[in-house]
Amino acid sequence: MAGFGLPNFGQITEAFKKAQQIQQDAQKLQEELDDMELEGTNEDGRVTVWLSGNQQPIRVKVENSILKEEEEIVEAAILEAMQKAHEISTSNMKSRMQELTGGLNLNLPGINDDN
């Protein structure tokens, strides 16, 4: 420690280097998440939704057979596939962000939550 209880210049420099590295890693992670295609499929496999790692919709596949069903069944199948894709995508993002910030004890809403 330097005088007056302040950290020495070397510690400050090291902290800035670490912050810059995290920023670079975060930018790389953002690009990786954008390029991912994570899929969620409804229970009977007739509807599939793909999202990016950032929860952006990419595409939807609906089998012809389900279109012969009642409207509520089709809607429920699409919603189920969307929810599964979103769950997979958000879980992946949280995991990747925790890897990035590991050990820093950052309180990031939605990332460090146990919910």
Curated annotation (Swiss-Prot):
Keyword set includes DNA-binding: yes
A molecular-function term among this protein's GO annotations: DNA binding
Annotated localization: Cytoplasm, Nucleoid
Source organism, top-level taxon: Bacteria
Keywords tagged on the record: Cytoplasm, DNA-binding
Family: Belongs to the YbaB/EbfC family.
Function: Binds to DNA and alters its conformation. May be involved in regulation of gene expression, nucleoid organization and DNA protection.
Protein name as annotated: Nucleoid-associated protein Pro_0020
Species, as recorded: Prochlorococcus marinus (strain SARG / CCMP1375 / SS120)
